[in-house]
Amino acid sequence: MDDRSLKLAEDFVSARYIEAGRESLRATARIMRSILAQRCCPDEGLTDAAIELILRQLSLMDTNNLAHHVGGGEREGRVVSALVRMRHFHLTHGIGRSGDLFSEQPKAAGSSLLYKITNVLMLDLIRQAGAPSTAAAVVVPMATGMTLALVLRCVAKTHMKELMKEAEAVQLQRTVTKDSTSATSAAPVQEPPMSEADRDRHDRTSLPVPATPRYVIWPRIDQKTALKCIDAAGLVPVPVQLRPAVPLARSAAPCVSTNRDSLDRGQDSIGSPSTPTSSSSLFLECHVDDVAAAVNAVGGPSQVVCVLSTTSCFAPRLPDNTVAIAQYCKKAGIPYVVNNAYGVQSRRIMTRLDAAQRLGRVDFVVQSGDKNFLVPVGGSIICSGDKERCKAVAALYAGRASMSPIVDLFITALSLGRRGMQTLWSDRYKCRARLIRQLRVFARERREVLLVDDSDDDKADEDTVGGSQRTSNAVVPRNDISVAVTMRAYGLPAAEASSSGAQLGSEQAGRVTNWAAARALGAQLFRSAVTGPRVITPAPSTPTTIAGCTFRNYGMHQDREPPCPLLVIACGIGMSESEVDALMARLRDLWPVPA
């Protein structure tokens, strides 16, 4: 209602009550005006009624909701089910036009505006998460894997154009050099006369045409989507094997091991003050030297479409060192794409991505909508430090796109606001600290090892390492989302478990461990309504082939046989402290302390 309508309403209801209603309407209008002007998420979340009012107003701007609309085409926003119309707030036209997500629809001004607003809301929240160098964000109504495939096709297309421009520049330089040499020659060689058509044909055939790059350098992560998106894009993955991670330097503290030999100790050391409850040395990471070696192995940067690395991952893998890889890609002239599936919730990951964008080359960063913003599966956010790159990938999308994931993110961003998202991020670190404290006791009681980043043993502060403040140049990739517990003797009789202690870590350790019992624990957890934790068992004799690549011990991120199965648990955004307590209670019931 406008001011004129409200003034007339005073003839029906007391003016002081109408004035209170006017102020409520103005408050919502001010927030919407602020979003449009400042292009950022509001600090405080809006009520559901206010958000629904905004959605209704936007939907009324679409032609299918005009009072006297007459449609004479094949796609006029017609929806036969009233329930479906309500589910979509009458926003039925989708987004994009003629194969470009950013194109405005003449029939859907409200939907087009909502999409543009959602993009700036996501950009603002991603900047707030720790990546202020991000210049643009585009929401794509596909899950992470297919969005990565779209990005890879865009990178391949753009990179080929760059190589062609370089080849043309080389040819131009050769022509200039040849003309200069001919002009200064004392006895120029008389060339036979050529027709215009022959000369044009000669110029085209002499242009060096670069080979089409088709390789994607991919640090190994045992997650099928990461490989299948490369295959779906018609490219060839080149896996880079991981190495054992270098332990973090940390202050002296009891009950913490930084040596792989912690798995080789006998029973006498178990339960003593030096009992290992954490071990960084069992983590795995990618070295930038191995990335460079993989590039050289396929023929150099001209044969490589991009490097595709991963930030968010399951233990014992660590996030890739995005800063080092970005610096290498900038030096080598190779595009760099980051799979940041659920990394927005990690302050560490986001600050390193920001540093990578500032110090090196990062073409695209792709993150999931559901894993980071707690919405239904179906949407992803593509980010870049270059607005033109985001425009290019949006223009590559074929056809129109679904509105559902965009509406979900729009509602969630307005409902939470900046402070609401910050609270969710802070609560995750509190839950993580609570989970680690309980898992530490759990592992010690069962004579197992908790695999967790050493610097996080007793602190939830993501900006400290080993009890000291992190310096700006200390860019060390670490996993602050996922942890793991060893299952060295799970399912073994007490006597056998005790006698096998001296052999733990050797090649025989995996053979004496009851892997079938370990796998059964994962099934029991699922039947107990506990989802998320997974049991990973070594499989040295059962190779797994995905997209033409064969792996051993798939799920453990390494070909060499790990010493034992692992119980992997992630503390993701939205997890509550009550869930942590319930998880640990059911885990204790299914995995009791050995007698």
Swiss-Prot record:
Residues 196-205 have a biased composition (Basic and acidic residues). Residues 96-106 are annotated as: Phosphate loop (P-loop). GO terms for cellular component: cytoplasm. One of its GO terms (molecular function) is tRNA binding. It is found in: Cytoplasm. Disruption phenotype: Impaired selenocysteine incorporation into proteins, such as SelT, SelK and SelTryp. No defect in promastigote growth rate and in their capacity to infect host macrophages. TRNA binds at residue 358. It comes from the Eukaryota. The modification N6-(pyridoxal phosphate)lysine is found at residue 371. Pyridoxal 5'-phosphate binds at residue 75. Residues 174-208, 257-278 are annotated as: Disordered. Disulfide bonds: none annotated. It catalyses: O-phospho-L-seryl-tRNA(Sec) + selenophosphate + H2O = L-selenocysteinyl-tRNA(Sec) + 2 phosphate. Residues 174-187 have a biased composition (Polar residues). Keywords: Cytoplasm, Protein biosynthesis, Pyridoxal phosphate, RNA-binding, Selenium, Transferase, tRNA-binding. Substrate binds at residues 97-98, 105, 400. Pfam families: SepSecS. Pathway: Aminoacyl-tRNA biosynthesis; selenocysteinyl-tRNA(Sec) biosynthesis; selenocysteinyl-tRNA(Sec) from L-seryl-tRNA(Sec) (archaeal/eukaryal route): step 2/2. Its EC number is 2.9.1.2. SUPFAM superfamilies: PLP-dependent transferases. Homotetramer composed of two homodimers. Converts O-phosphoseryl-tRNA(Sec) to selenocysteinyl-tRNA(Sec) required for selenoprotein biosynthesis. Belongs to the SepSecS family. This is O-phosphoseryl-tRNA(Sec) selenium transferase. It comes from Leishmania donovani.
